[in-house]
Regions:
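Outer-membrane beta-barrel porins/channels
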Residues: 4, 9-433
């Protein structure tokens, strides 16, 4: 059970003959997004995450950051001065890739086809608080403005491990990631009744981008159990060793502040009432996700992150249709359908920069989303209640990582097809005073 919505509207009637008939003031809270999800997978991959560790280390090397030199000089790769990618640095510390005897690459892995285990837990959500004012002109023109405030709280715990040989060698990678902060936006809406004698309604709405100020907090740890050879005796032995960014940073987590600007939203709607019993409605909405931008706190654009969004996402069209039929004036049945196209390009990948703090390499390219709703409502003189069933379905292509190649493309393990479905029962109560 969740209490995800609450609000009120205060209506002021100014007169029956004045141009401005009503002014309404409202407030509404609702859970705009829930991140709660747990995912587990395992299997033979054909590729190893250690290849991605080595690839990031090579990228750092060509950018002037040599992990072998850092080790020799005692330079901490995990702090701000080190400016190294954590995935490559942890893999290097855990000795999961080599640095010599290769003809072309500074670093290269020795694992190619491990058995992998993956688990992630995501928790939190986005709470939205809307403050609005609306105007009714001659019962034919309706205009409203809404200022929205957002509170973001997201947490992801990530675990990934590989059995890298038949002799018991393995490694485990873990990270804890949090994003918290706040944002705001503005919404402008207009509804017109173009013909006084007709129940036809036309609507237009524009939503500004949401301007977020966020803080990313992370820590990571790797542990590996590997076979070694004693140089003096020649005997083989297995040794477990682990490395933690929390320890390397002096018992601290790493914090990064950034800003996010979401796309503009454009909405068109159409409504019509047939007689006194049947109401029909339809909407079309568009958001271009490739226009999202990331910024540093100082205001400069984060070029790499913004370019990745531009290359991997696209515009999303959303269609909504609904109908309400009043059996008697107090009771009504409702049906609704909502379709949103996919936000990701077909071959979208998660590509980490050479200095990325992220070690959670997994990603899922979600497909189109469908919502189906069925409900019943009661309207009394001072009390109303609504009961609705909502079913949501969305497919996704899941990958544990994407490995860059020398040609500029990406290799991935075989795709895992995922279907996310959710059923909800929503009950709403309201009072009129």
């Amino acid at each position: 059970w969740n209490f995800d919505n609450a609000g009120f509207v205060f209506s002021t009637k100014l007169g029956n003959v004045t141009t401005l008939r009503y002014v309404n003031f409202g407030f509404n809270y609702h859970k705009a997004k829930s991140f709660n999800k747990t995912t587990t997978m395992e299997g033979q991959l054909g590729l190893s995450q250690t290849e991605l560790m080595a690839a990031q280390a090579n990228g750092m090397f060509y950018d002037g950051i040599d992990l072998a030199y850092y080790t020799e000089k005692g330079i901490n790769p995990y702090d701000d001065k080190g400016n190294a990618g954590w995935l490559g640095a942890l893999g290097w510390d855990a000795e999961l890739f080599y640095t010599d005897d290769h003809p072309t690459l500074p670093f290269y892995p020795y694992v190619t086809n491990p058995y992998a285990n993956y688990r992630s837990e995501e928790r939190g959500g986005v709470d939205q608080y809307d403050f609005n004012i609306a105007f009714n002109f001659n019962d034919r023109v309706y205009f409203g403005i809404t200022i929205g405030a957002y509170d973001v709280n997201y947490r992801k715990t990530y675990y990934y491990g590989e059995d890298i040989s038949n002799d018991g060698e393995y490694y485990d990678l873990w990270s804890d990631n949090r994003i918290h902060g706040a944002g705001w936006d503005a919404k402008f809406g207009l509804i017109l009744r173009p013909l006084e004698e007709s129940p036809l309604r036309l609507g237009l709405a524009i939503h500004t981008p949401t301007f977020y100020k966020l803080t990313y907090t992370t820590e990571a740890e790797i542990g590996a159990d590997l076979w070694y050879v004693d140089n003096e005796t020649g005997e083989e032995f297995m040794d477990y060793h682990s490395y933690s960014t929390y320890y390397k940073l002096g018992d601290k987590k790493m914090n990064r502040e950034f800003e996010l600007r979401t796309p503009w939203t454009y909405n068109l709607s159409l409504g019509y009432t047939v007689g006194h019993n049947l109401a029909l409605g339809a909407e079309y909405e568009y958001q271009n996700y490739s226009s999202m931008k990331f910024y540093y706190p100082e205001g400069d654009k984060m070029e790499y992150e913004s370019s990745q969004v531009k290359n991997n996402t696209k515009g999303v069209s959303t269609f909504r249709i609904g109908a309400e039929y009043k059996v008697i004036p107090e009771f009504a049945f409702r049906l609704g359908y909502n379709y949103s196209s996919a936000a990701f390009e077909k071959n979208a990948v998660k590509a980490l920069s050479t200095n990325s703090l992220n070690v959670d390499t997994d990603y899922a390219n979600t497909k189109s989303l469908s919502n189906y709703t069925l409900g019943i409502g009661y309207r009394g003189s001072s009390f109303y209640a609504d009961l609705a069933y909502k079913y949501t379905s969305q497919k996704a292509d899941f990958y544990p990582f994407a490995l860059p190649t020398e040609t500029g493309t990406y290799d991935t393990p075989a795709v895992t097809k995922v279907t996310n479905s959710r059923s909800q029962v929503v009950f709403t109560l309201g009072m009129r005073f």
